[in-house]
UniProtKB/Swiss-Prot annotation:
It comes from Rotavirus A (isolate RVA/Human/United States/WI61/1983/G9P1A[8]) (RV-A). It holds the Pfam family Rota_VP2. Residues 1-45 are annotated as: Disordered. Residues 1-88 are annotated as: 5-fold hub. GO terms for molecular function: RNA binding. Homodecamer; each decamer is made up of two conformers of VP2, called VP2A and VP2B. Interacts with a VP1-VP3 complex. Interacts with the intermediate capsid protein VP6. Interacts with NSP5. Interacts (via N-terminus) with NSP2. This is Inner capsid protein VP2. It comes from the Viruses.
Amino acid sequence: MAYRKRGVKRENLLQQNERLQEKEIENNTDVTMENKNNNRKQQLSDKVLSQKEEIITDVQDDIKIVDEVKKSSKEESKQLLEILKTKEDHQKEVQYEILQKTIPTFEPKESILKKLEDIRPEQAKKQMKLFRIFEPRQLPIYRANGEKELRNRWYWKLKKDTLPDGDYDVREYFLNLYDQILIEMPDYLLLKDMAVENKNSRDAGKVVDSETASICDAIFQDEETEGVIRRFIADMRQQIQADRNIVNYPSILHPIDHAFNEYFLNHQLVEPLNNEIIFNYIPERIRNDVNYILNMDMNLPSTARYIRPNLLQDRLNLHDNFESLWDTITTSNYILARSVVPDLREKELVSTEAQIQKMSQDLQLEALTIQSETQFLAGINSQAANDCFKTLIAAMLSQRTMSLDFVTTNYMSLISGMWLLTVIPNDMFLRESLVACELAIINTIVYPAFGMQRMHYRNGDPQTPFQIAEQQIQNFQVANWLHFINNNRFRQVVIDGVLNQTLNDNIRNGQVINQLMEALMQLSRQQFPTMPVDYKRSIQRGILLLSNRLGQLVDLTRLLSYNYETLMACITMNMQHVQTLTTEKLQLTSVTSLCMLIGNTTVIPSPQTLFHYYNVNVNFHSNYNERINDAVAIITAANRLNLYQKKMKSIVEDFLKRLQIFDVPRVPDDQMYRLRDRLRLLPVERRRLDIFNLILMNMDQIERASDKIAQGVIIAYRDMQLERDEMYGFVNIARNLDGYQQINLEELMRTGDYGQITNMLLNNQPVALVGALPFVTDSSVISLIAKLDATVFAQIVKLRKVDTLKPILYKINSDSNDFYLVANYDWIPTSTTKVYKQIPQPFDFRASMHMLTSNLTFTVYSDLLSFVSADTVEPINAIAFDNMRIMNEL
């Protein structure tokens, strides 16, 4: 509770700061004025004492001087303001830091709203290239003596050949690759959009994308390319079948890349779009609401497509045991809801001055009136009324817990609080705050009216003060009203597959206000036997002020319910109710403002606001589910790649970052690991699983194409001669493992049994450790002489570690430093290690040419509601669920 009390004082501190700043401005302006006067005096004295003669010509100079003085004073005041602004900003930053320390996942409100609204369906971005892991590259050929030939040869190599630094596990590379594919995985491919002209075509044909065109270009220009292939490239063009709405494009792809792109083409998420789908996309309650007039554009083309949003419910149950995460989600929902709740502007409310004047007359305030009655009018203004209206609806929409702020001696606040507790379900208030407010109402108004002793409430009592009072009060009307409040809960109703928290029908139609008024009338008629006459009169007048506005209160209750339920129709995630870590403060004086200033003007959300709210909710919910699917897929992949323990926290952190609204470093670790456990239980989505299986089946090909991943290492006690290789020159590389004793690296890491390997090495038998591991390339002859590869031997025999194993591949050829040492002296270089690596796949043009098929054309629409034109009836005619006007009191 300590930090809540600090929060209460914050406003006072801010006011003090503002006053101090004002004083500083005054002091600074005084100082600057004094400085100016001193400067002027100094200038005058200089002029008098100086012996120089001055010729005075005209008055224009004086005018210029005056202008300059004005300019300088303006500049000084600007500088002052800037200094003060920076001070204010600094103070805000300090307060923000203090707040961050108390709230685990706190984010500034404006940025949350922007982040929420910026979440767009990823489908909107067009895919302008095919997905590729490999690219063909020209590599030189070396002669037997290590000199480079003029000829080249084409091989398939990796486009992005990057490995995590300082890590044995090449499997991390595959996990990162999979993560990258999940990010880039297109929801649809329209080849017509990405097709580019084939420069070497005879008849202006097109190929599938720019990379295919550049590969064709490079091969066409290569001197060693056969004439048949050149003629084939010249004939490469698209084939259109207009009657079937199909087009075929030629592409140059590695077989694995072809498998990926074929999969993407055959598993597109686009679906045909028609008017019925758009009609059903609009929430049913808004479609059926007679206050909104919806018209639809009927001119949708047959090629229209859309991507169905992924709106699965409660897969992680973040409301259950994720206090910090749930607090952030409800906060962001609250800020979004506040931005869409309609404003009660001054013209929609009763004039504040006129209302206060009327209240003063009703109170018959005179000079001798007791202090408590003058408090009734304190803090009543239209801004507070509007703030209260927005807070109540937004808190219910986001299921944010509210806490009440009030002064016990202000009876008017407490009487307004009676209306608040009648209309808003108990669950919405912080338990301690609810108990304090109920206790104040009981001990200030209810018990004194009947002459009962003060209630002494025990902290931690399972019953609330109203529940205790309901059993003790004999008066039927008051007990009946207390009974209603004690049982005022949200009703959970599933509408269109979404769990909604709905209000009691008596609240929706405003009839509960009559029940409240009956109880208030009964209380005002009581004698208050143990209290002085002034006390009784104050309470009676407070009740009179509220009862005079019976009609307006009924209308206000109906208006509140209607706005809540209409906006609730746009919520797509289940409305789970759990008390939140932090609360939204609500001043009871602002509730009084709302009760006293509500007019007879109906305010309902505009259709554009509803559509905006619905779109933001759909986009967030869909993104949330897609990111869950990504995280579940990555966790499964990490498990199957034996990286399970290592990567888990970073996977969950990435998942939260991609949801946009979380301040991830502040999420407690226990919630991270609980989130991991929940994600682990979910099934992997089919597309993502198929993609991972494609990677798993082709790991060998990917390793072969990399310049940083070896497929094993051979270690010997004695030196082995470097061999000649066409791709590298002289190199310590093994293309096969025939004749070597083999040990699996994964087995060695898991068992930790190094006995077998050390015995073999000490008996002068070479050992081949088989498994993917990183290697480094060195082309320095000097370092080969220095035998740096001894470190590999030491890792195994002495340190008994393979997790940091990084063998060196020596490449000695005409491109190497000091190659003349080998060439001139017929020196035969040796090494105690050999890197096992198979030859990368040679590039064969005929085998790499694939025809890809897709629809000739279709148009994907992301904003379905843009086809709907909407309008509202005149607000005065707007009706509620019972077919009666929302506001009856005219």
